[in-house]
Structures are given as C-alpha cells and as structure tokens.
Amino acid sequence: DLFMFFFFWEMMLVPMYFLIALWGHSSSDGKKTRIYAATKFFIFTQASGLIMLVAILGLVLVHFNQTGVITFAYADLLKTKLAPGTEYILMLGFFIAFAVKLPVVPLHSWLPDAHAQAPTAGSVDLAGILLKTAAYGLLRFALPLFPNASAEFAPIAMTLGLVGIFYGAFLAFAQTDIKRLIAFSSVSHMGFVLIGIYSGSQQALQGVLIQMIAHGLSAAALFILSGQLYERLHTRDMREMGGLWSRIAYIPAISLFFAAASLGLPGTGNFVGEFLILLGSFASSPWITAIATSGLVFGSVYSLIMIHRAYFGPSKSDEVLKGMDGREMIMVLGLAVLLVVLGVFPQPFLDTSAATMHGVQQWLGTAFTQLASAR
C-alpha cells in the first residue's frame, strides 16, 4: 500500500530528528550545532517526501481516471497505463525522494552534517538503516511502477552515481572531522549502489543487496569506533589525534580492518557487493563501469588517509588511553564476523534475493529492450 509506505517513510524522520537535536554534538570546529543539523535533515527529507506524495497522488488519480476506483494498493497501481510524459514526471517525483535519502549528489549536503552532529547511535541508525530504505524504495517502487521512464532515465542516474563516487571521495580527502570523512565515504559507496540499480542486470542488482548490507555493517562499525575515540579524546578532529596506535589497545587494529573492508578487502561483503555491481553493469555500460572501477582507487586513498591521520604519525601525548572494554569489543567484533561471513558465504543471500531481483530485472530489462527498438 503506497499510502502506508509514505506514512511510515515520513515517520522515520521524527525519532531521527530528536536523536540529533536532543542528543547530538556540535561540529568539531564549533560552527555548526546539532539543531542546525537536525533542522537541515528534516527540511531536506520532508520536502522530498512531499514531492513523492504529489507523485503518489498523481498515480492514484491516473488510475482512478482509467478504472473509476481510488486505491493505493501496489498490485493495482502496477497495472496503470501511463503516457510517456506522465510516467517520466511521476517517476522523477519518486526518484527525488529516494535520491535525497540515499543520498545522490547534489542532494546529499544534509548527510555529513547529520552524521557529524548525531550521537553514535544516530550515526549507526543513519548508515545502517535509513540510507538503505532509499535503495529499497527505488527497487520496490520506482523501477516496477515506472519501468519505461526508469529505462530512459537510467543513463542520467548512472552518471549521477558516477559523480557521487568521485565527489564523495574527493571531499572525504579534505575532511579533518573523522565522522564527516566516513559520511562522505558513504556518499561515494552509494554511487555504486545507484549504478547497480539502473544497470538492468540481475547480477548487479544482487550485488546492490550485498553492498547495502556490507556498507551498513562496515560504516556502522566505523561510526562506533569513532564514538569510542571521542569518549577517550573528546575530539573528532584528526589533527588532534596521531600516534594512537601505541596509546590505545585494539581500537587501531580493528579500525584498520573496517577501513580496509570499506575499500573492498577480499573476504568481506564489501568486495563481493562491489565486484558483482561492476561485473553486472559492464555489459550495459562499459564506460561508466570502467570509470567507476577507477573510483575504487580513490576509496582506498581516503580510507588509508583516515587511518594514517588518526593512528600513525607523531603522537600528541605520551598518555596511555583506556582500551576497549568487553561491551565495546563485542559490538564491533560481532559486526566484523557478520561482514566476513557475508564475504565468504554470500550464496545464501544471493539465493534468497534471486527471485525478487529477477522480477525487478525483468521489468527494467523489458523496458530497455523496448527503448532500444524504438530508437
């Protein structure tokens, strides 16, 4: 039911807003407050949600004109016949809402502020759950409801994904706040997801699923580790860190593992997801795939820059800091185990998603074929 989907889509904003506004922090430079970040997050997502509501009502109205029945039922709306121009406009309404939440450049600017000011739990929630609902929305609603418009829009969407990969990587280089660096790395990783979704390949679509799960695990772990650093150092500014490898037990080594996983370390879920996305996308878009592959190099650079700035180099102090306690260790090691299991045994996840992703691929693949024959 599209109305229920929209209702709960908007309900997600409320707890996240209060998580940032009430329990968040100021930015490391002190210029941006948690209220600023929470308000920016709310405005971006609320405005895009209203655009999607207009698109939903437009689709319902077209269906009513054809059948005389007002319904928000997904199965009924799938049967609605749409004129090409109408389909494209309605698809854009859905795409904009999901692009803000994913996020897609240039609709991403709320994410670094939200991550930087959110408490650790809020950042984990954002990276692990909220961003993934946007990809789910594209796969479940935008592509099946508007396959022809999605096929026509695919080159633009894949180009936006490509821009996101490099834009997120370049801005990650420039960050001094460790949470903002991880946030921009998320923008870069979601570029691969967008390319996979619009590739029209079942292999790439299954890679999208693996990549979303793996990114949720690795990004959540990196935010947890940055929160643990903040508890000990009372700063997220990497210029105030340095030399921590010899001053804190366990945290540097575990951070190195998750940073390597984030850049696609073989044996982790991130490698499987990115590999399937690039392999599946190559047949339909070889140039975009080739350029996106080079973006992985930049991913490795900003990940290693983060590790070098925080844990190596000259030490700011000789004080030995408290190591990880049992609770902190269990949290991150649990995520590490899940990430390795996903990387070594992805087949159960691929088998589970095969039928669903085949259906999505059929909708988009048929539309691609019709578009090619029309040209």
Task: Briefly describe each language-model feature range.
Residues L13-L22, G93, A97-V100, V104, ...:
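Central hydrophobic cores of alpha-helical transmembrane segments in multi-pass inner-membrane proteins
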Residues I43, L92-A99, L126, I156-L160, ...:
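Hydrophobic alpha-helical transmembrane segments of multi-pass membrane proteins
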Residues V105, A219-L222, I288-K322:
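Predominantly late transmembrane helices and immediately cytosolic-facing juxtamembrane segments
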Residues H25-S28, T33-K40, L50-H108, A142-I156, ...:
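Juxtamembrane/interfacial segments at transmembrane-helix boundaries in multi-pass membrane proteins
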Residues L2-L82, T86, L171-F184, S188-D237:
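Alpha-helical multi-pass transmembrane bundles of energy-transducing inner-membrane proteins
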Residues L13-V14, G49-L50, G128-K132, L162, ...:
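Residue-level recognition of pore/gate-forming positions within transmembrane alpha-helices
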Residues P112-A114, A118, L130, A134-G216:
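Acidic, glycine-rich loop-and-beta core segments that form the ion-binding/anion-interacting portion
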Residues A37-K40, A118-G128, R236-A253, T289-G295:
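Membrane-interface alpha-helices at helix entry/exit sites of multi-pass transporters
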